[in-house]
Regions:
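Extended catalytic core of nucleotide-activated donor transferases of GT-like folds
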Residues: 66-131, 149-165
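A donor-sugar binding/catalytic signature common to diverse glycosyltransferases
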Residues: 100-102, 107-113, 304-349
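Catalytic binding pocket for nucleotide-activated donors in carbohydrate/polymer assembly enzymes
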Residues: 325-389
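Catalytic donor nucleotide-activated moiety binding site of glycosyltransferases and closely related
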Residues: 60-71, 145, 258-304
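N-terminal pre-catalytic "stem/leader" segment of glycosyltransferase-like enzymes
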Residues: 1-83, 467, 473-597, 618-621
Length: 621
């Protein structure tokens, strides 16, 4: 794409388009895409141009090194795609871009430029070549060098806020430069006075979509697999070596990820990752998944960079991030933030993002993680800057942008209200721990268990206060549960890659619908696992959000049922294992039920014989 490559299209534009058009008396609006990142902002505003009088077109400048993913994205949008060379020779009524780069000044029509992040905050050198490639992130041979008479490094220009990016031959490239806040206008006037008259304050459509979706936070949490008492931690990284994902600074993430899954109880915390599209499409989705494979087996959900990241921010209890726009959006929503990477190089020191990076709390990788996360949540006070400076017209970007677009096109606006698409409800993505779990339990009475599960800890996790540790295998005396020791067992998903861990597990589990023809009935699968794995004491088939079937080595088969929002049924099964190990008879659990304390919540679990013809009265298991 770009570079003029590709056959020129013949309809609905081209020399003979009039012969082939079905609707030719329309105004042409060209969407100018640089990469997937900039395209996301154009997707935000597409609903404002749904009009019988408008023909949408798209093109890609080819100026960004991040070209992967663009053809697929434009194909999904489903509008005619012009090669860049044809786009520059096609008269349009309006061109809309969300970045600078390529020969934008050669577009044959009026040009509106949006920001593809939270305003303009980063410095970036322009290349020597005749075209601009703002996404390249590389310095030209002379950029940043000391000149003989200067004696000091010349700072790079601020991307989107400097003559180098905004002017050609002293004239503004854009007819309208959309800003979201007067703070940006003040910096623009100071940095590039000739372009100031093109500025239009029209808000932030991306942020407005998030604000509009705030009432649906609980739905988003359920969609992302959050259960009662569980907290969602979002790991967010922009691109470049100084980012949280990058290896140009402390290279924190490779060591942080196993600590997060090993130190945070799996039922107390849900982990998701939101990575910049330039990470995905620069290194390749397959490579990104490979780098994060171990963490994903430990329960990390890796979100598509286009689909659900905003819903994740709305659902989050905490974001661990860096100097990118997504982390700033999280702070603007009032979500607690800890910075895992906080570089100031490359940021405009006068920008709100730079001020946020200077003042936001940091994650200390040398200290235990869980206390830091819990303090960040409990002691959180929203940052005023992000909330106030992201947009000066919250909820109004749709109306303001549509008015601007139609003024530039030269058409009266449609009579219907200007509306952005609501954020969709994500697909249900429950956590999957396809790894071994270290399970710590303490019996509070014969039918009540306190429980914590840790994914692949490299050391015995520090005991939370709720699980005071006593001498292994001993009781501190008193009634059941009074000073009872913390006991440990291993639970493993059947698909755990480490087959030795599966072979040694006390509890083996899997998640699948009860009618999965590949596995057979849940009770039969449980019997098969026990026959194949002599070390296993309990097999667990999780068939629904609140239901599992378990079978003991002596053949007692039970169904555990709880509310769908309660803990993972595999956790309930581990609690049952603890009760049975302590001598509680299955018939007593059937009569009294099971109570599981985990994730700051108390879950009631009903225990019934899996086969109504059996009463579960056996005491051995």
């Amino acid at each position: 794409m770009g570079e003029g490559a590709g056959a020129w299209i013949r309809v609905p534009v081209g020399a003979e388009a009039g012969r082939w058009d079905t609707r030719g008396s329309v105004r042409r609006v060209l969407l100018v895409v640089h990469n997937v990142t900039s395209a996301t902002r154009l997707l935000d505003v597409l609903p404002l141009l749904r009009d019988w009088r408008v023909q949408l077109l798209a093109t890609c400048t080819g100026s960004s090194p991040f070209q992967a993913g663009v053809p697929e994205l434009l194909a999904e949008v489903g509008v005619p795609v012009l090669p860049w060379a044809q786009a520059l020779r096609t008269r349009v009524d309006l061109a809309v871009s969300a970045s600078f780069g390529g020969q934008l000044h050669e577009v044959c029509g009026r040009l509106a430029v949006l920001s593809h992040g939270v305003g303009y905050n980063k410095t970036l050198a322009t290349p020597d070549a005749g075209r601009r490639t703002p996404d390249a992130g590389r310095r030209t041979p002379d950029a940043g060098r000391r000149t003989p008479d200067a004696g000091r490094r010349t700072p790079d220009p601020v991307f989107g806020m400097s003559d180098a990016w905004l002017l050609v031959d002293g004239e503004p490239i854009a007819d309208a430069m959309v800003l979201s806040h007067p703070e940006q206008l003040a910096r623009l006037r100071a940095a590039c006075p000739p372009a100031a008259h093109t500025a239009v304050l029209a808000g932030d459509p991306c942020f407005d979509r998030m604000l509009d979706a705030r009432p649906y936070r609980d739905r988003f949490r359920r969609a992302l697999g959050l259960r009662a008492g569980q907290r969602l931690v979002v790991l967010n990284s922009t691109w470049n070596p100084a980012s949280l994902f990058g290896d140009g600074g402390d290279d924190l993430l490779p060591s942080l990820l196993p600590r997060l899954t090993g130190e945070l109880p799996a039922d107390d915390y849900r982990l998701t990752a939101v990575l910049h599209p330039n990470i995905w499409h620069g290194h390749g989705p397959g490579q990104v998944r490979a780098w994060l494979e171990r963490a994903r087996r430990g329960g990390l959900a890796l979100l598509d960079p286009l689909a659900d990241w905003r819903q994740a921010l709305l659902a989050a209890d905490l974001v661990i991030g860096d100097h990118g726009s997504v982390t700033y959006y999280a702070a603007a929503l009032g979500t607690p933030v800890l910075l895992g990477a906080a570089p100031l190089d490359g940021l405009d020191p006068a920008s709100p993002v730079a001020e946020f990076v200077r003042t936001a709390p940091r994650l200390d990788p040398l200290r235990p993680l869980r206390p830091q996360l819990e303090s960040a949540i409990s002691d959180h006070r929203p940052h005023r800057g992000p909330a106030e400076l992201t947009t000066s017209v919250p909820g109004k970007s749709a109306a303001l942008l549509r008015t601007l677009f139609y003024d530039l096109i030269g058409l009266p606006e449609p009579d219907a209200p200007a509306l952005l698409d609501p954020l969709p409800l994500p697909d249900h993505t429950p956590p999957r721990h396809t790894t071994s779990l270290r399970v710590l339990t303490r019996l509070l009475d014969p039918h009540e268990v306190e429980l914590r599960r840790y994914a692949e800890p490299t050391y015995e996790p520090e005991e939370p206060e709720e699980l005071p540790e006593g001498p292994a295998g001993t009781s501190r005396g008193g009634r059941p549960g009074d000073g009872e020791p913390v006991r440990a067992h291993t639970a493993a998903h059947e698909d755990t890659a480490d087959r030795e861990a599966v072979a040694a597990a006390d509890v083996i589990f899997r998640h699948s619908p009860a009618d999965d023809p590949r596995l057979g009935p849940p009770a039969a699968w449980c019997a098969e696992v026990l026959a194949r794995r002599p070390q296993c004491a309990l097999a667990v088939y999780v068939s629904a959000p609140g239901t599992c079937t378990v079978r003991t080595r002596t053949g007692v088969t039970l169904t555990l049922t709880a509310d769908a929002s309660a803990a993972d049924p595999a956790a309930h099964a581990s609690a049952l294992f603890a009760c049975l190990s302590a001598g509680t008879a299955p018939r007593s659990l059937i009569a009294n039920g099971l109570t599981v304390r985990t994730a700051r919540a108390r879950h009631r679990v009903t225990v019934t014989p899996a086969d109504p013809a059996e009463d579960g009265t056996g005491t051995a298991w």
